[in-house]
């Protein structure tokens, strides 16, 4: 979970997991919740996710994007939490292939975060932008 001080850098969430009970499975995902909409960044984020997913299975990105969009939809606000991402659970097709996918999800998140933060970390922000961020952050809960 990344909640930066700089409102120009979006909040970003990532997790992966391997659940081991009588049945074993992988789950996880990542999503982005910007305070300030940046359509170029949104396109970049989704392109990177799609590229990574397609290395494993061309069906993953549309399936996991849809799952994320539904999972992070806020019905009480009638809006999505952010700009989406991917989300999956109960993934137990082939352990070795699933584990490679999980590792790529983590590596891709680290790469995306590094690129976004590097691009925006020294950008100044206004008081109004900070207020927008605080409002969005309060709605994140």
Tell what function each PLM region has.
Residues 1-141:
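A domain-level signal for the structural core that forms small-molecule/cofactor-binding pockets
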């Amino acid at each position: 979970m990344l909640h930066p001080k700089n409102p120009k850098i979006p909040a970003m969430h990532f997790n992966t997991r391997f659940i081991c009970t009588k049945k074993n499975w992988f789950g996880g995902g990542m999503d982005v919740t910007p305070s300030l909409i940046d359509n170029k960044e949104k396109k970049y984020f989704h392109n990177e996710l799609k590229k990574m997913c397609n290395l494993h299975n061309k069906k993953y990105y549309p399936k996991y994007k849809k799952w994320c969009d539904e999972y992070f939809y806020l019905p009480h606000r009638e809006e999505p939490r952010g700009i989406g991402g991917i989300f999956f659970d109960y993934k137990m097709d082939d352990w070795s292939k699933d584990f490679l996918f999980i590792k790529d999800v983590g590596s891709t998140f680290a790469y995306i975060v590094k690129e976004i933060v590097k691009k925006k970390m020294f950008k100044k922000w206004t008081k109004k932008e900070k207020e927008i961020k605080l409002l969005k952050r309060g709605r994140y809960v």
